């Protein structure tokens, strides 16, 4: 019999083993769609970003007008920019849901896959941050100033570090040029880490909603999950296109329509919505270094999750108390997101502090406690 090129060709063989003949659990739900959705978001961002970079000028006197020029004079430039800006929002929606799925179903017990995922999240956050600075509007400039300034809280080397990052004594032209370079570079770093992420995942195979071995019941990825992924894709692209075409500025800040001015501070400096939860935690601590540490901890705490798993069951499918706690954590994060968008005044300060405290308490103390309690309940 003639050899099947799909299974013998060195390159096609890799694609076949990853996307076609990949043995997949037969019972994974729509929560397992977000990996492929993230891949699609990523490719969309790379393509639109490349097209935008062709028309962008990384200079403080030209950046703002070059973005305006792209939207006004380049064929479909407005669409490319709107897809890129809102595509970032959908990227974060997908990654947060992907992480939430991992938390709920105990996927974090694949430690290498989980840890590379956390590194991916951090790299994505860095990419989004430097990208937001590029249009050089008011919020771009002041966001860059506030966030880079946080590094000055690091003892002894802080101030030197900040001036080194800025390329001067304030956010200026050198900062913008290096941020553009970083915004171009980091997506390729993300692509590399993604391949590592998938390599680790394919070592163990996918988890499933029951959290038990699915070796006895595997089905090929194609056509079953390829068609399921296409459904997920249409369900994501529809709202993305709707947003980009009908209300492209809904998630942006009106302040960014004003060119950057170092002499005028906006009344409320706040990041894009997907960073608000971390921003709220940062603002909840009245000490600069403490705030920076809490900000870092809010994301890095994910690295501790595998070590805080005390339950005998992997997933939360049959653990109602853990489920309740999980959804309380989700509500808590939504409250933090809302508080982060509000001015620093009563009652938002105290709400933010309570929500920050309950965020860390839930993850570090309550989840392990409830897991242990549920283990005891299994014996009765």
Swiss-Prot record:
Heme b b562 binds at residues 84, 183. A ubiquinone binds at residue 202. InterPro entries: Cyt_b/b6_C (IPR005798), Cyt_b/b6_C_sf (IPR036150), Cyt_b/b6_N (IPR005797), Cytb/b6-like_sf (IPR027387), Cytochrome_b (IPR030689), Cytochrome_b_C_euk/bac (IPR048260), Cytochrome_b_N_euk/bac (IPR048259), Di-haem_cyt_TM (IPR016174). Keywords: Electron transport, Heme, Iron, Membrane, Metal-binding, Mitochondrion, Mitochondrion inner membrane, Respiratory chain, Transmembrane, Transmembrane helix, Transport, Ubiquinone. GO terms for molecular function: metal ion binding; ubiquinol-cytochrome-c reductase activity. PROSITE patterns: CYTB_CTER, CYTB_NTER. GO terms for biological process: mitochondrial electron transport, ubiquinol to cytochrome c. Its cofactor is heme b. Belongs to the cytochrome b family. Heme 1 (or BL or b562) is low-potential and absorbs at about 562 nm, and heme 2 (or BH or b566) is high-potential and absorbs at about 566 nm. This is Cytochrome b.
């Amino acid at each position: 019999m003639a050899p099947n090129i799909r299974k013998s060709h060195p390159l096609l063989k890799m694609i076949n083993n990853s996307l076609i003949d990949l043995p997949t659990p037969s019972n994974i739900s729509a929560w397992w769609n977000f990996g492929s959705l993230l891949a699609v978001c990523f490719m969309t961002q790379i393509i639109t970003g490349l097209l935008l970079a062709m028309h962008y000028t990384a200079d403080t006197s030209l950046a703002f007008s070059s973005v305006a020029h792209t939207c006004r004079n380049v064929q479909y430039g407005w669409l490319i920019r709107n897809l890129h800006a809102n595509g970032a929002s959908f990227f974060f929606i997908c990654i947060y849901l992907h992480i939430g799925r991992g938390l709920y179903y105990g996927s974090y017990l694949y430690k290498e896959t989980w840890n590379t995922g956390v590194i991916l999240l951090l790299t994505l956050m860095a990419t989004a941050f430097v990208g937001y600075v590029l249009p050089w509007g008011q919020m771009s400039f002041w966001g860059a100033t506030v966030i880079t300034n946080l590094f000055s809280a690091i003892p002894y080397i802080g101030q030197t570090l900040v001036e080194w990052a800025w390329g001067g004594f304030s956010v200026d032209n050198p900062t913008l040029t290096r941020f553009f370079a970083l915004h171009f570079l980091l997506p390729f770093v993300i692509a590399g880490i993604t391949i590592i992420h998938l390599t680790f995942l394919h070592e163990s195979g996918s988890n499933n909603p029951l959290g038990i071995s699915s070796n006895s019941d595997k089905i090929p990825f194609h056509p079953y999950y390829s068609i399921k992924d296409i459904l997920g894709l249409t369900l994501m692209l529809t709202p993305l296109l709707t947003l980009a075409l009908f209300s492209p500025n809904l998630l942006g800040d009106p302040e960014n329509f004003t060119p950057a001015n170092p002499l005028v501070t906006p009344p409320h400096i706040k990041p894009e919505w997907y960073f608000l939860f971390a921003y709220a935690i940062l603002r909840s601590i009245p000490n600069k270094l403490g705030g920076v540490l809490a900000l870092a901890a809010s994301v890095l705490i994910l690295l501790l999750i595998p070590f805080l798993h005390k339950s005998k069951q992997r997933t939360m499918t049959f653990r109602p108390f853990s489920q309740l706690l999980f959804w309380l954590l989700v509500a808590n994060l939504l409250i933090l997101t809302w508080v982060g968008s509000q001015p620093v005044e009563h009652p938002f300060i105290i709400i933010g502090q309570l929500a920050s405290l309950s965020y860390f308490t839930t993850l570090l103390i309550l989840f392990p406690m409830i897991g242990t309690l549920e283990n005891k309940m299994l014996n009765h």
